[in-house]
Amino acid sequence: MNRLRVLVAALCGLVSAQALGEAADTIYRNGSILTMDGDKPTYVEALAVKDGRIVFAGPKAGALAMKGGATKVVDLEGKALLPGFIDAHGHYINSLLVANQAKLYPPPSGPGKDVPSIIAALKQYAEERKIPKGELITAYGYDDSVMPDGRLLNRDDLDAALPDNPVRVDHVSMHGAVLNSLALKKFGISAETKTPPGGVIVRKPGTQEPWGLIMETAFLPVFDKTPPMTARQEIEWTRAAQMLYAEAGMTTAHEGATHLGQIQSIRRATDAGANIIDVVAYPFITDLDKILAGFPVGTWGQYDKHFRIGGVKITLDGSPQGRTAFFTTPYLTGGPGGEKNWTGEPTFPQDLANKAMKKVYELGVPAIVHTNGDAAIDMFLQAYEFAREGNHDRPWNVTTIHTQFMRKDHIPQFVKYKVRPSFYTLHTFYFADTHIANRGKEQGSYISPMRDAIDAGLRPTNHTDFVVAPLDQMFMLWSAVNRISRAGAEVGPGQRVTPYEGLKSMTEWAAEQYGEQDRKGTLEVGKLADLVILDKDPLKVDRMAIKDIRVVETIKEGRTIYPASASSLPPIPTAAKDSGKTYAWTSRPCDMAGVNTAAGRVWTLTTLGGEKVDLAKPPTMQFAGGRLSVFGGVNQLSGSYALVDDGVTMGELVSTKKAGPPERMALEDRFAKALKSVDAFRVQGDELTLSSGGKEVAAFVAAK
């Protein structure tokens, strides 16, 4: 009988060889099951899943022939079933922070339409979380460009609402924040604080008192004084962050600008078993050598507990709304600092961009390249040609990220080189008015030209750039299909795509961008059962209603991960090295003997590796608030520490790149290597000793 039923299944549809003689774990039926396979929409009556993979897609009779005693049959009740959405570009590591913050995006993505709404949302967040007095309250998504009548959020607003807590409200650009009085004090910003070059500290009218908003370089000390995550937080915040993706129907997350310390953090959480979706990281080209030292390229590419390194990130310019994107013609509104005839600037000169692309090509890994302005895209194409040296036979997976101001003459070159553009159509809603003001109507309306790219034979992807824009795949699809600004104006309607093409850019074509088209992106036999259930079919509703479609359920490899109430997820794992007694370097009292006298003092290096350091200007070190600052004699190094029980956990060390006398450079290198190995310390009066594995590696004396 079993053989007969399997034969029926094989005759009625597609069934995998491994499913022969085996009952399915789950069968989905009675809905719009959209496979996303092919140039035109294809629906099947039923889908069967076994051991995390799709084993049947076809007629209902064939699927039901695979029903066993333990098979779960899901009646979709007319809802839509699609492949799980794939994040084409975003900043996953930042989601670990915002998952534990109040969301203040303006409508339609959040409550932050004006100052009273922001204050109400912050108070509600603090009450729901039962945040105790004195604890920092953080939020993200504040957009001052949409505040009515120019009434902006300031410290007085935050002080009145939350007088007993430091409050930090991050700007939507992630380049600044509004702080209340307690937060300004916490981060050491006062009337006496000078505005650093390239920074902004908004002052209260008629005074030098900070009024709350700090931006750019003035914002950097806030990061420097923010303690690193504990081992427990890495795990708990990973799970909370990945639930944000699951809630949006996403089964693969993109970490598109990764430093070494962040990869190490993701790896630790991965090894602890925290992941419920796939995470793919693309380290910065500037960190590549350091990352290769710890993560050889032979370990890239293949998932290990749902994490892998996917390639290398190169950034060639800034943002068009911030007027830092690089163009061939000047901005109509000048530069961000009032510069005339301002075209923006590249992140790297052309020769360095060439070398960077060549390095990635020779390494044999994919490249993702941030290009916003048309001049940056010109730079990319030149660097691509330099790397290839005319040899285009070897496949090379290259994607340009954002690609917003692609010119029409760029498209044939992308086709020729088989480069995939990843577009950012959400800007047609959020920033179209700004782009048109900065670049003129013709160029500002041609942003993210997805229609022309598809018509030329390209298979572009689309992305949210989360956390810069909200993690809302249906709103992203709506923006690609409709191209309507926040003010209700059409923005380049000739570049609209069909709903099916828009879905392609976040499923099949996104899988191709990752090089994972053999396992993701379509509902085909043998592929992973990464699925999303929507309350409506995007192809069967009015185009303007697409943004209102909601995610009902998200399934990763056959297991429900959203909603949490219906999921079969295991408990959040416990950090192996975290006993719940974790301390950050601080000047406040704690159980670690000697830390009170050690933090905040200037420590001068006296011995290194058992050898006396006898220099007129020896290296010095300071630490406080979880941050470490070192002057090596030529270069400045910075990093982070955490005290765990009786030991020290070192974070990433980053150094400036100045050159100096060979003997000083050699000493710096030895000093940096010693610091990276530290696992314990001892303070005796004005003397500090650092050790590794029970052996002293460096000794210091405190400045008098």
Name the predicted role of every residue range.
Residues 2-20:
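Gram-negative bacterial Sec-dependent N-terminal signal peptides
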Residues 23-29, 38-295, 301, 310, ...:
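Divalent metal-binding segments
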Residues 51, 133, 525-528, 557, ...:
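Short, flexible surface segments
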Residues 60-61, 108, 141-143, 173, ...:
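A mature extracytoplasmic/lumenal domain signature
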Residues 236, 357-368, 375-398, 402-403, ...:
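His/Asp/Glu-enriched, well-ordered alpha-helical/loop segment
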Residues 563-581:
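Extracellular/periplasmic ectodomains of large secreted or surface enzymes and adhesion receptors
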Residues 575-704:
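Lipid interaction determinants
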